[in-house]
């Protein structure tokens, strides 16, 4: 478990105090995939680097598995960092070292294992990330996705409890991003690792995360289960991320619907309700007619969800709306 208690970080630049992270409290439960999303300058990288103490907090307390890591001395910090792996946006591989040597680097530096043990561990890691046949290659001979898989193998070398991902997919194409996210999900599931990732892409959060924190200007403005935050955003920053992911311009959509008759509502379904024949049932029971103006069905990690924008006319609308609510469908009246 990772806990932040009123943690903040301020940099001094040209004699001025510049806050990168305002006083922040959060909790990441063990075994979770926890996402932090924000635009450039939001403070997410600072928050991530505070977890493994690459940055020293200006105040507050950081507790990991019951240990106050803000109070560790140099030896304690070195021991703690062996429990935290990290992968980076631009891979940070040594160009003059082979794939196997890059993965072995943390083990070699730790000095706790024989050469034979290191070789065995490296072979295990390369098999896990699907690169057993690339052990003797150099980074220049690899694709971007393969380089990131080497980075993941290296981060797992010391058998960490926590894996930090700093924009790990932002330099990759969509197909490669999907394969890397699938690998991270497998690692989380099979090794019970706690994963904290930062990104500016809502789709990354939607695919792999259990919980999400949305950051803006050094502040966590919204936090919760991904489905709750993604489907029912409360803060303007969160709503912008959701609209960017959906590729929806609400002003344009309102203009498109201006000529449509009736009440316009947006329904959000989750889980089994996504596939239930609710619209037909409600129409028969209440006598309303409906037109589908927009819609999508997708998944948030393992949970299916659907969103429909409807124009409803005729019949008993109040009864129809009550029926939607009774079926645990979130309804938003747009007009």
UniProtKB/Swiss-Prot annotation:
Residue numbers binding ATP: 38-45
InterPro entries hit by this protein: AAA+_ATPase (IPR003593), ABC_transporter-like_ATP-bd (IPR003439), ABC_transporter-like_CS (IPR017871), ACT-like_dom_sf (IPR045865), MetN_ABC (IPR041701), MetN_ABC_transporter-like (IPR050086), NIL_domain (IPR018449), P-loop_NTPase (IPR027417)
Catalytic activity annotation: L-methionine(out) + ATP + H2O = L-methionine(in) + ADP + phosphate + H(+); D-methionine(out) + ATP + H2O = D-methionine(in) + ADP + phosphate + H(+)
Annotated Gene Ontology cellular component terms: plasma membrane
Keyword Cell membrane: yes
Localization terms from the record: Cell inner membrane
UniProt domain ABC transporter: residue ranges: 2-242
Keywords linked to the UniProt accession: Amino-acid transport, ATP-binding, Cell inner membrane, Cell membrane, Membrane, Nucleotide-binding, Translocase, Transport
Membrane topology: Peripheral membrane protein
Keyword Cell inner membrane: yes
Pfam families: ABC_tran (PF00005), NIL (PF09383)
Entry EC no(s): 7.4.2.11
Top-rank EC class of the record's enzyme: translocase
Subunit structure of this chain's protein: The complex is composed of two ATP-binding proteins (MetN), two transmembrane proteins (MetI) and a solute-binding protein (MetQ).
Sequence similarity: Belongs to the ABC transporter superfamily. Methionine importer (TC 3.A.1.24) family.
Function (record text): Part of the ABC transporter complex MetNIQ involved in methionine import. Responsible for energy coupling to the transport system.
Protein name per the record: Methionine import ATP-binding protein MetN 1
Source organism of this protein record: Pseudomonas savastanoi pv. phaseolicola (strain 1448A / Race 6) (Pseudomonas syringae pv. phaseolicola (strain 1448A / Race 6))
Gene that this polypeptide is encoded by: metN1
């Amino acid at each position: 478990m990772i806990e932040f208690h009123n943690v903040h970080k301020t940099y001094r630049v040209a004699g001025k105090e510049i806050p990168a992270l305002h006083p922040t409290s959060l909790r990441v439960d063990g075994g979770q995939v926890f996402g932090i999303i924000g635009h450039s300058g939001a403070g997410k990288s600072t928050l991530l680097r505070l977890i493994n103490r690459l940055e020293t907090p200006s105040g507050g307390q950081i507790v990991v598995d019951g240990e106050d890591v803000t109070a560790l001395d140099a030896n304690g910090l070195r021991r703690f960092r062996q429990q935290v792996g990290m992968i980076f946006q631009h891979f940070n591989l040594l160009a003059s070292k082979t794939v196997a040597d890059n993965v072995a680097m943390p083990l070699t530096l730790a000095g706790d294992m024989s050469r034979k043990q290191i070789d065995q561990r490296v072979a295990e890691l390369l098999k896990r990330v699907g690169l057993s046949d690339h052990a003797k290659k150099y980074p220049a001979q690899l694709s971007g996705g393969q380089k990131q898989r080497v980075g993941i193998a290296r981060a797992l070398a010391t058998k960490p409890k926590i894996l930090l991902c700093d924009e790990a997919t932002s330099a990759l194409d969509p197909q490669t991003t999907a394969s890397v996210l699938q690998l991270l999900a497998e690692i989380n599931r099979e090794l019970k690792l706690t994963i904290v990732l930062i990104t500016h892409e809502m789709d990354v959060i939607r695919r792999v995360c259990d919980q999400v924190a949305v950051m803006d200007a050094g502040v966590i403005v919204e936090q919760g289960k991904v489905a709750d935050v993604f489907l029912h955003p409360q803060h303007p920053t969160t709503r912008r991320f959701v609209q960017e992911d959906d590729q929806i311009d609400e002003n344009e959509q309102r203009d498109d619907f201006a000529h449509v008759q009736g009440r316009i509502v947006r329904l959000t379904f989750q889980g089994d309700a996504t596939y239930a024949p609710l619209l037909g049932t409600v129409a028969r029971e209440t006598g309303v007619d409906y037109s589908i103006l927009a819609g999508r069905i997708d998944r948030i990690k393992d949970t299916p969800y659907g969103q429909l924008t409807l124009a409803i006319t005729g019949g008993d609308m109040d009864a129809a709306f009550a029926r939607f609510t009774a079926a645990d469908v979130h309804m938003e009246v747009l007009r």
